[in-house]
Amino acid sequence: MWFPVTLLFLAGVAVATNNHEHAWETGNEYQYSVFGRTLAGVDKLKRQYTGIQYNGILTIQVKSPELLQAKFDNQHYAHIHQELSNGPDDFDDPKNVNYKRMPMSEKPFEIKLKHGIIRDLLFDRDVPTWEVNMMKAIVGQLQVDTQGENAINSKSIQVPSDESFAATFKAMEDSVSGKCEVLYEITPLTVNEIQAKQDRIPMPSLHSDGNHYEVKKLKNYERCQERQLYHYGFDIKSAGKKWAGQDKVISQLSVTEMVISGDLKRFTIQSTEMKNEIAVQPETSDSPIGNVYTITRLTLKKKNSISNSWFGPHEISNLESTGNLVYTFNNPFSDSDNRRVRHHSVSQNSEQENSSESSKSSSQSSSSSSSASSSSSSSSSSSSSSSSSSSSSSSSSSEEENENVVQTKAALQNIFLAPNIPLLPYFIGYKGKTILKSDKQNVMQFAKNLISEIAEEVQITSEGYEATMEKYTILKKLLRTMNRKQYAELEQYVLQFNKGSDSRANAWTTFRDAVLHAGTGPAYVTIENWIKSGQVKGAEAARLLSQLPKNVYLPTPNYVQAFFELIKSPMVTQQEYVNVSAPIALAELLRNSYIGQNYYPIYSFGFITLKKNDEVVGKYINYLANQLQQGYQENNSRKIQTYIFALGVTAHPKIISVFEPYLEHSLPASTYQRTLMVAALSDLAKVQPKLVGPIFYKLYLNENEAHEVRAMAVHEFILTDPPMITLQRIAKNTNYDTSKQVNAVVKSTLESLVHTKRSEWRHLANKARNVRYLVTSNNYGNWHSSGYHLDFQDWLVNGLSLQTIAGDDLIPKYVYVGVNSVFDFLDQPSVEAGYGLSSHRQFFNEISKQWYSHQADDERRRSRVEKLAQALQIKAKEQNNLEGHFLFNSVYDSAFYPYDRHRIREAVAALKQFLNGNNKLEGSAFNNYENIMSFANEDGLPFVYTLDAPTFTKAKVNFKQGGRTANSGTFQALIANNVQQQFGFVALFEHQKYIAGINNNRVLRVPVEYDVEFNSNNAKNFALKIRPQNLPRMGNELKLLHYSVVPFTTQQDLLDLKPTSNDKNTRPVFTSPVYKTTVQKDTFSIKVESDSIGKESDTESFVADVLRLTNANDDHYTKISTILTSDQIQKSEGHITMTYDTVTIGGNNDNSGQSSEEMESLHSISWKSNSKERRKQIANNLSKGIKSGEVYIFDVSYSVPMLHENEYVFTFGGMKSNSNQKLRGYFYWNSHAPQEVNYEVCFSHEMQYAPRATPLNFKYALKNSPRDEYKAVLKYGKTCATGNKVVITGSSSQSQQLRDIIENSSLPNNVWKRFQTGNKAVENCMKANDIAQMRDQIDVQFDLSNIVPESVRRYAKKIIEYLEKYVYKVCDNVSREEESEENTIKNTLLFASPVNRMWPNWLPQSVSDITSGWSPSFNSFGPSSESQWQTMRLNVADYPDEFESEKQSCTLDKDKVYTFDNQLYNVHLGKCKHVLLTTYPQDFHNRRNYIPENSKVAILAEDADNDSRNVYIWLGKQEIKLKKAGNNVQAVVNGQNVEISDKGYQKINGNEITFEILSLPDDSLSVVSEKYGINAVYDGKRVVISASDAYRNAVRGLCGNFDSRPNTDFVTPKNCLLTKPEEFAATYAMTQENCQGPAPENKRRAEQSTCHEFPENEQMNVISDREAGRMMTEGVNWGYHQANRNKEHGRGNKSHQNNKKQYQANSQESGSSESRNDKKKHNIVYRTRVVEEGDEICFTTTPLPACRQGARPTERYPKKADLYCMPRNDQSLDLKRRVEDGANPDFTRKSVSRMQVFQVPVSCSAA
């Protein structure tokens, strides 16, 4: 390249002859001494190394400038395994090093060059491949490109213009490790430098007329065109042909320094030294844990004329080409070397006239490669004794094109053969061949012995586990080298164990999981045979299939095809559990092998799977899609869920078109299923966000779509990192979107992303910060949908993602949790868990129905509420089938379990059966996680890094029933985990592995026995005795917990197959002398062995040191064991007693006159264990001064009586009083001996809330400033009475500044105007009440006694500081005022954002949004901002939707109703009872209008005389009537007038308060029922009803249906939506009960009004043709430039028309181009109808048309049908249940009882 520019600038001074070109002079012989060393060590801790060093003589004869002949002889090598104080660069011979002869052939070989660049090496055919690679490494050190033959054209090239000038350039150059970029630096040496480098210039007299140059070569391993590298478990990316680096775990640096004499055209290499360093730095470590160092030095000894020739005719004919310098592979299973011939090196800058030569050479190389491939294939086939029908003679084009492909066609196509991986130790450990070839070790017998040893050692009673898990790793790796016949031999060995014995079970578990984790073709065939033969089935088979994709080594096309055939077999499709895990496993296999190709070493070994996409789509994806369609045809929810999830796991774009008809409502699917489809698209969105993002966005924009689907879609859309403008649109839309659930997701997701620091979300986080101020300021409750993404500054866990979608209860119906860690793969979290459920209410009702018998329900009398629902003829909306799933996925395992109503019934029945008898549970399993990386080192020996992390889990549980109140049993568990990181190299010539690493073991053993007694009479008592189980064979000690970290170096014989911990050559790395100690505790002992704990450590520092040693980043030698001696085992029986009790404070309480000060004045308290007296004392203390309420007591006692006499007591009591507006708590703890107490802690606290402000009286709320007070007393010491005392007092109140703002604002005037209309309880007025009661100031004071130690004072101050920080995180500004006395600490905190109450809830951060002049940016409330405070004004009218109350409420005002869902309408009741709220039977197929007892609630109202209104509240069997009598309001309970005293009225049933009636300060009444979750406030005319979230979408009446959708509030009992409020209200009027007013006429009109359907989801074009991967057919007539657009999208030509016709034909075949009418007809199914009347159950004799699940009728017509009726009995009820489950019994032969007309659908459309 730049050599023409130099114009031979040294030619004038050179006196070389024409036969001297570059480094070699024809006819001469050069002799170099060779020294090499390779060492591995954990030198992060200590300079202790293991490895080899060798020497020899390399003689080179120059036959011509382009041909060299070489020979390496007199080779010797020595082992090094010791500490080198000066590090690996110390060239002084280490101590006690013994050299021995290296077993090399010493046969001469030829080297072909071109312009000094080595192009080919030819060796004798009998020379082993490992020797070839070592010689390539040595000879490669003499390759030097002084003329830029391979230089890369760039601006940084520095060309030498004179012999005194340096040269710098980059070249792409071969070496044994690969073809990578090399930085050349050529510098002339000065006289002083020559003097300093005399050892590097052994023959300075050569070229005496020339110069000496230093040539430095620095290799860049991140820019390689070719690498010989195998990896597994790493996601290595490559851009085009450029190597993009191995991973963060491995980094490599290579520097070569060469001294030459002469000029840059003709010179002699005096010496060369290469230093290579491989650093191992896992992501869990801050710095490299160790390194592998390689040093190779060549020094010129002689230069003479050629004395004799090495080659005769026979030797020449036996030479074969081995290609360029890059590492050569061979077939490890072949009896011969059968080398893979590499291509020749072609100079990058050769002249054009040489192009034909290069082409010819390349062609010859390709031909040789093809020949070798064929030979290798046949050899591999012959080496196996088994055959496969999968074999094929067809050639792979990818293999022919890429000579790097090391897999033979037989190994790729025949899954009965072991894979060919010639870089892993067990594949090349015996002279470059698999260790199975060795006659020194019977590997099969050794594998059998390993299985037996592991089976014995995994017994819970076994002792050591340090080596067990490593033995399992060895077994797993051995299995990878075996074929199917050898697997079968091992299987027969395992089956010879005694059937039913523990040894048989353990041996089977070991072999089964080792086969699973081997991950090869023969391993798969073995598992397939187990499943087909029934040897494994059910949950066991499902586990094997679910883990298989995580462990497969080479997912070849034949492997995937075989797995595909398996999942289609009846043994899989018809088997429980397996038919779920199998398709999901196939999907994961497709994702990893076709989409995650970087997971496998395709850039070194070629594409393992097919590159084309046709087979994936045409065969596998289509199969999954067809199964999904079949699931809908069968109405099989479990199958539908399974294949939705499986399709999503593939992350293939084809799934968009599969989900399209369901997401667009063209085909019926339930809301739950469509939500699951959107979630399934999230995996594809991570791979192709620009493709899937717009689909999510369009689903979100459709406000007629279900909120679950929209919430899921918008959350996933935000995570696709959309453009800023779109994110702004979403944020702003939260102020207008009517769905609070969707808005809550947007707000929570954006707010959490604002604080994330994860690199992958950096751009998204910046966008979230920019749009956060556009988001609504509404504060949404915990029950709303949400999305949270958190960061963790931890070495292991990086982040946490949480997504919830709200449902019909407080519990979300969809929850997803993802944990990101260093083990993330393919953008997937390391751990995923979650569940989905269509309806919690249905779920729990189904469980309750199956768990408790309801046989007596049909006979008992119906309640008042049930009769009301029947009288109104409330018809439950037909609900979707109950369906749901559980999900768990990790690097170890995955599980997806879908269920429906039938599975819940089966699960409940199985659980009941299990709990009612003596049963055993037992299970064990190995789990596997590993990373592997191996590549050719610069010395020609394979470098290997492995991370193996097997885990073994075993559990045994025995249950023994001892009657209804007692049981006993045993529980044994064992968890063993080993994490071993090893790195080093393999010396193939001696089957030795030199490795360093860190071995980390963790073992947990829990063998216990227990006895349980419980009594649930008055107080609930629970007594537990638990003791260690004295296991046999445990000796004198029981090791409960073991933790060890052992850094080590070793030299290991690969044929010994021993764990490193058992190898005699293994040497732990000690950084200092090891200190051993044992610390005795009462119940256990701790043994510690470490090199980082000193003898001088005291007890306190010792514990801290032990905790420090367990830090995952500490790699020092450590062993910690927690043990029980035989004496401790006998004495370690623990006794635990727990008691729970409740006390109701009611009308008989005589403590009302005592003050609250006495609450904490217990001067003495019963201190003995399980003291009934103590519980009574605490209960009495909590109830003092309380008018009514409930007290809860929880008491725990713990002792180990045989070990020590001390016992421990913990008692907690809590009290809540609605009448007193108080919360109290009492905490007591002590340690005591049998006769005296040793230490006591007493803590009491009380929260006194401000008097309850009525929501119906703004005047009172404005006049009375709120103030909540808090007091706590802490006492501790020998006794509470004599010990230290700390008093904490606090209050939350409304500051004077805020009070002035409210009173001087327009708020009061606006409210008075509302009052003039007679409506005091409409929305704005109630919110004004809440604003008037805001708190914005907290006062905290600590009073300390004189004897309180200084540490307690520091803690008190820290509490204040923490409170400030917490408040600051929530609020914008905090003002602090501190006043300290000697024993008093006072603080006042002033909030910028007021709160509604002192502790429980915070209002939105930007409460300033509701004001017209409240600035949120104050830093303090000092004098400088006083004027700003004075200018603040509140204007509630400007902010009707900003303030959210703590609980949703419904209000009946003078002539208006304000519903739960914020719908306001006029109403006139008249003297006619109207139902404001009532529950109703939720089950559409309810057999008798049954309503659960705790949901039997109804509230009615009617106008009365004197401009008043009567209200009726029904709670179960209780009836409360609220009416106005004169100027007072009165309560009538069950027909009896009751007097409401200052402590209220309580209705107590047993020991439970059913409800309370309280008098409020403005004389209105409040009815509170915590049992039923209802609160009603009544003032004689108006009523405000608050209901818990349990009533969402579960009520009807004038208050609406409480489903968060205002447009569905006017729903009638018959599920029709009306538009006129007066007609809607009349449908809930009790017109049959002496009704006076407009209701009867309005009800008649309502019956004649048009019945509008519920607003269902409309069809919408969510997915375009392009997104679905189809030919564009949309928008043909849209726009003014159709021609250009058609041209752009391939339309408007004959080819397009033909494609379009073909597409339509294909669509018609698949049913996707059906007409709209056809689709509507397909949505019709035929079902038997059930009619219940009186004591009869009737069935239609023939099935009638009905809409498919998820569809709704678009047109109906009347149809007469015959009925067959049966008496109501068990037989008819069972038949009814069968029909409801989908059965269509044949009643055509039954007698017709009567006829009835039904409205049946003509057509149905998707909901």
UniProtKB/Swiss-Prot annotation:
Name it: Vitellogenin-2
Residue ranges of domain VWFD in the record: 1448-1636
- Glycosylated residues are N354, N579, N635, N1181, N1304, N1373, N1506, N1693
Q: Which residues form the Vitellogenin domain?
A: 24-819
Key word Repressor present? no
Disulfide cross-links: C180-C224, C1450-C1599, C1472-C1635
Q: Which N-terminal stretch is annotated as signal sequence?
A: 1-16
List locations, semicolon-separated: Secreted
The UniProt function text for this chain reads: Precursor of the egg-yolk proteins that are sources of nutrients during embryonic development.
Cite the residue spans of the region called Disordered. 334-402, 1635-1655, 1684-1723
One Pfam family in the UniProt entry? VWD
Biased amino acid composition, Low complexity: 346-397
The protein's matches in InterPro entries, at most eight in alphabetical order, are given as: Lipid_transp_b-sht_shell (IPR015819), Lipovitellin_superhlx_dom (IPR011030), Vitellinogen_b-sht_N (IPR015816), Vitellinogen_open_b-sht (IPR015255), Vitellogenin/Apolipophorin (IPR050733), Vitellogenin_N (IPR001747), VWF_type-D (IPR001846)
Q: Where is the composition biased (Polar residues)?
A: 1700-1714
The molecular function GO annotations come to: lipid transporter activity; nutrient reservoir activity
GO CC term, one of those recorded: extracellular region
Key words of the record: Disulfide bond, Glycoprotein, Secreted, Signal, Storage protein
